[in-house]
Amino acid sequence: MEFKAKFLKLTAGLPLVMLNKNAAEEMGLSTSDRVSLETYSKPPKQISTIINLVDKIVAKGEIGVSDEIIKKLSLKEGEKIEVVFLPPSKSLIFIKKKLNGKALSNCEINEIIQDISNNSLSEPEIALFISAMYERGMNMKETIYLIEAIIKTGEVLKFKAKYLVDKHSVGGIPGNCTTPIVVPICAAAGLTVIKTSSRAITSAAGTADVIETIANVEFSMEEIKKIVKKTGACMVWGGSLKIVPADNKIIRVEKILNIDPESQLIASIMSKKLAVGSKYIVIDIPYGKTAKVDLKRAKILKKKFDYLGKYFHKKIRCILTDGSQPIGNGIGPALELMDLVKVLDPEQTGPKDLEAKSLMLAGTLLEMTGKAKKGEGTMLAHKILHSGKAYEKFKEIIKAQNGNMRRLRFGNFKEDIHSKKKGKVVEIDNKIVSALARLAGCPIDKFS
């Protein structure tokens, strides 16, 4: 059917269309039905999405389109477009199969991920898939299929470098912002680091959230190549790239659900590393009573990453670290940035636990690449850090990402809370600390 495009003048974060409710009902359509939009241009441009029904915003014969669709189809206001109503996705059958505890085939997982990437599944349907993974889990074959399917939906960054390294944490520990310290240490040592990070899913701040307090984190592939050629490293948000679009859409729903299934966590990490061509990878797996995983699960995760490293021909080193309590002094993007700058700047004194962990992780990469002898990596990392070279490299990266250290600011409100009892702190609940920071506005409000 033919409709006129009406600009909704809104950015939804995903392709969004609206149809007049009465007109849709006459056609037998309901909210969450699937449609394909195609232009009459040569060559035609096409996008699939889910419809939303409204009473007044859109008239009969019109289709309301968000900014994402306008950009994708290069539309003009009032332009006529062909709208085809699509049958229910086969993916729903496969998602129900996983909910019933059955293993999915390569083709079935590919179908689901392709539909997520093509906007053929609604957010509630993606949530159902995430819940199925969370409740039923995935075996190693399924996880590999998931990794490969996620990579297929996006582009692969090709960058020539002798030592292309990466570091990732499974997360869950407040203040565990070691990446912005590890990256400049490694870059100052002559290693290349293309660090694509997520924004926070269940925590108060992800690496991208922290860096975004003082610099841009959204760049195109070509812009990233220029930054890395100039500085040897970058710290950017993976969601702005086209490398793993399906993963980004899954993460968006994970944030709403506040859950991060193990199979998806592994697939998310591995797909990003493979898509940017990382050869040497260190994975930090914090464990503890209120961490994402306990020691038993941490050991299982390590075995899985070790297996995947061999399967995909990558050198992966998993390090199990103490996740019994938060790291550093501040929780949230701005406060964590302040902590890491104090660690990087030789003229300031930063949190010792944050420094020690960062040096250990950076030292591991230095040893893996042969930049340091076995057992001497942490010592070399310490030397680079305290010489000021890492801080200079950090500032160089921030400048290349159109940043400025002066952009850092803090929230207007603060309160000192004193205990009514005397005693010693014997335990800190990571999840409660993260929840408090999120209630204060993190990570959306970077300066809370």
Predicted regions and their residues:
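Well-ordered secondary-structure scaffolds
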Residues: 101-106, 111, 116, 156-158, ...
